[in-house]
């Protein structure tokens, strides 16, 4: 019941083992374990549950206790001001060489310490949300990351105790078999292990966050649709917990890539869009090793140097619809008209591209053609104007009217033509009558001549 006593007395805190972590914020630690508080009657509650199995569960009943379920994958680390929890300080002190041993047989070699730290950080310990000191049983109950929806505390404690027993056995075996190392080597390895434990103590397993394997050619990005504030606060403290054993200690680099935004753009994004920080992992080769590999290309096929994991925070903007905004006044054109507008835009773009891609000679040719066309069009208009003036002069009613419009000229000209045609028909009929009269007079004159002879 040590864990329940710690939960009931949240004000009791453990002093940090390292002096460098003096700026600890205990209020945030209290907030991190607050979801695990349950009712005051734990013993009676579980005793009642064992006695009455057939009764329906109460609203505050821990129904998952009887199933002995494993905890779910851990949540993102909570917002903390410093990395100073006693659990990972205990881990750092337990795996670091001690001064009272004087570099004797009780210390690990550098390779063994790196391997054990890698197994501890990358194994099931992080997935079970516990990082404990093997020598101290009180740290078994110290919860670093735990989902409040699940409460498989007893099963997780059993697994942790079994894991710690195996680690203690491995420590004893390695203590009896490993040769004595120098104090300088142990001091350097202890400093590196302390930095590693301080950096990756409150981290989660990367296989949970990044389900895809890490390749040298591509670095897949895992995007989550969680709340932006929670994710940004957790991504500030998120570090990679994978490090290869027997590798040169190299620092983990964390940098942020966010595009610069102006004031107007930021105001618009606050209304319609929401920023999400996406953490991506990629492998980057140090510049020193890169220069060495570039200077000696003829050394043959050698093993590529170990490159550290680099965490990048990218800026991804997802559009969120603002339902409180007034409706837009943009008109929805029908499909046919929209297709016509799109086709017109495409044709305009094609013509612009042709104009831009055409050489200067084609531009001069087009200018010459346009100039000749303008001259011919001007000549045609002048001739048409002269013909209208001539037609106006032929009409008796519009002969002296210089401001007569073209429509009036055409109408009067049509009426005048019809009247002239009617006069022509009359004159033709009169001509025919006169010709007949002439024929008759000629025939009568010949008869008179014949009778007089």
Curated annotation (Swiss-Prot):
A motif (9aaTAD) lies at residues 115-123. Phosphorylated by PRKDC. Phosphorylation at Ser-343 by PIM2 leads to the stabilization of MYC. Phosphorylation at Ser-76 by CDK2 prevents Ras-induced senescence. Phosphorylated at Ser-76 by DYRK2; this primes the protein for subsequent phosphorylation by GSK3B at Thr-72. Phosphorylation at Thr-72 and Ser-76 by GSK3 is required for ubiquitination and degradation by the proteasome. Dephosphorylation at multiple sites by the PNUTS-PP1 complex promotes MYC stability by preventing ubiquitination by the SCF(FBXW7) complex. Ubiquitinated by the SCF(FBXW7) complex when phosphorylated at Thr-72 and Ser-76, leading to its degradation by the proteasome. Ubiquitination is counteracted by USP28 in the nucleoplasm and USP36 in the nucleolus, both interacting with of FBXW7, leading to its deubiquitination and preventing degradation. Also polyubiquitinated by the DCX(TRPC4AP) complex. Ubiquitinated by UBR5 when not forming a heterodimer with another bHLH protein, leading to its degradation: UBR5 recognizes and binds a degron that is only available upon heterodimer dissociation. Pfam families: HLH, Myc-LZ, Myc_N. A motif (UBR5-degron) lies at residues 369-378. Residues 217-244 have a biased composition (Low complexity). The modification N6-acetyllysine is found at residues 158, 163, 172, 289, 331, 337, 385. Keywords: Acetylation, Activator, Chromosome, Cytoplasm, DNA-binding, Glycoprotein, Isopeptide bond, Nucleus, Phosphoprotein, Proto-oncogene, Transcription, Transcription regulation, Ubl conjugation. Glycans are attached at residue 72. Residues 216-373 are annotated as: Disordered. Its main location: nucleus. There is a cross-link at residues 66, 158, 163, 312 (Glycyl lysine isopeptide (Lys-Gly) (interchain with G-Cter in SUMO2)). Residues 368-420 form the bHLH domain. Residues 280-292, 329-345 have a biased composition (Basic and acidic residues). GO terms for biological process: acinar cell proliferation; amino acid transport; B cell apoptotic process; branching involved in ureteric bud morphogenesis; cell population proliferation; cellular response to angiotensin; cellular response to arsenite(3-); cellular response to carbohydrate stimulus. GO terms for molecular function: cis-regulatory region sequence-specific DNA binding; core promoter sequence-specific DNA binding; DNA binding; DNA-binding transcription activator activity, RNA polymerase II-specific; DNA-binding transcription factor activity; DNA-binding transcription factor activity, RNA polymerase II-specific; DNA-binding transcription factor binding; DNA-binding transcription repressor activity, RNA polymerase II-specific. Residues 427-448 are annotated as: Leucine-zipper. Transcription factor that binds DNA in a non-specific manner, yet also specifically recognizes the core sequence 5'-CAC[GA]TG-3'. Activates the transcription of growth-related genes. Binds to the VEGFA promoter, promoting VEGFA production and subsequent sprouting angiogenesis. Regulator of somatic reprogramming, controls self-renewal of embryonic stem cells. Functions with TAF6L to activate target gene expression through RNA polymerase II pause release. Alternative translation initiation from an upstream, in-frame non-ATG (CTG) codon or a downstream ATG start site results in the production of 2 isoforms with distinct N-termini, shown in this entry as isoform 2 and isoform 1, respectively. The 9aaTAD motif is a transactivation domain present in a large number of yeast and animal transcription factors. Efficient DNA binding requires dimerization with another bHLH protein. Binds DNA as a heterodimer with MAX. Interacts with TAF1C and SPAG9. Interacts with PARP10. Interacts with KDM5A and KDM5B. Interacts (when phosphorylated at Thr-72 and Ser-76) with FBXW7. Interacts with PIM2. Interacts with RIOX1. The heterodimer MYC:MAX interacts with ABI1; the interaction may enhance MYC:MAX transcriptional activity. Interacts with TRIM6. Interacts with NPM1; the binary complex is recruited to the promoter of MYC target genes and enhances their transcription. This is Myc proto-oncogene protein. The gene is Myc.
């Amino acid at each position: 019941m040590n864990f329940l006593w710690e939960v009931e007395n949240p004000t009791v805190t453990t002093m940090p083992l390292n002096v460098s972590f003096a700026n600890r914020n205990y209020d945030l630690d209290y907030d991190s374990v607050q979801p695990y508080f349950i009712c005051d009657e734990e013993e009676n509650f579980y005793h009642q549950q064992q006695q009455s199995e057939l009764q329906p569960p109460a609203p505050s009943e821990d129904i998952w206790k009887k199933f002995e379920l494993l905890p779910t994958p851990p949540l993102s680390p909570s917002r903390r001001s410093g990395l100073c929890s006693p659990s990972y300080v205990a881990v750092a002190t337990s795996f670091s060489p001690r001064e009272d041993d004087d570099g004797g047989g009780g210390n690990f070699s550098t390779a063994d310490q790196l391997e054990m730290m890698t197994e501890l950080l990358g194994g099931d310990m992080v997935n079970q949300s516990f990082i404990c000191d093997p020598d101290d049983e009180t740290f078994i109950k110290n919860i670093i990351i735990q989902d409040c929806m699940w409460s498989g505390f007893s099963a997780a404690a059993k697994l942790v105790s079994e894991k710690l027993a195996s680690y203690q056995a491995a420590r004893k075996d390695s203590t009896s078999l490993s040769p004595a190392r120098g104090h300088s080597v142990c001091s350097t390895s202890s400093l590196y292990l302390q930095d590693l434990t301080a950096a990756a103590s409150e981290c989660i397993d990367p296989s949970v966050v990044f389900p895809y394997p890490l390749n040298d050619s591509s670095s897949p990005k895992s995007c989550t649709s969680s709340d932006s504030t929670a994710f940004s606060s957790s991504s500030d403290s998120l570090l990679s917990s994978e490090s290869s054993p027997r590798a040169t200690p190299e620092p983990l680099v964390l940098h942020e890539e966010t595009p610069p935004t102006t004031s107007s753009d930021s105001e618009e994004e606050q209304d319609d869009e929401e920023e999400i920080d996406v953490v991506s992992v990629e492998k980057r080769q140090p510049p020193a090793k890169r220069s060495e590999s570039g200077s000696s290309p003829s050394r043959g096929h050698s093993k590529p140097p170990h490159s550290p994991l680099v965490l990048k925070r990218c800026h991804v903007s997802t559009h969120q619809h603002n339902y409180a905004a007034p409706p837009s006044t943009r008109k929805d054109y029908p499909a046919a008209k929209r297709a016509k507008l799109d086709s017109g835009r495409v044709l305009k773009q094609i013509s612009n591209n042709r104009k831009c891609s055409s050489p200067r000679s084609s531009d001069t040719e087009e200018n010459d053609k346009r100039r000749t066309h303008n001259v011919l069009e001007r000549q045609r208009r002048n001739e048409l104007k002269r013909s209208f003036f001539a037609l106006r002069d032929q009409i008796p009613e519009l002969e002296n009217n210089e401001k007569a419009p073209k429509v009036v000229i055409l109408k009067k000209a049509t009426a005048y033509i019809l009247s002239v045609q009617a006069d022509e028909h009359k004159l033709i009929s009169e001509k025919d009558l006169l010709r007949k009269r002439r024929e008759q007079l000629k025939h009568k004159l010949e008869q008179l001549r014949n009778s007089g002879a």
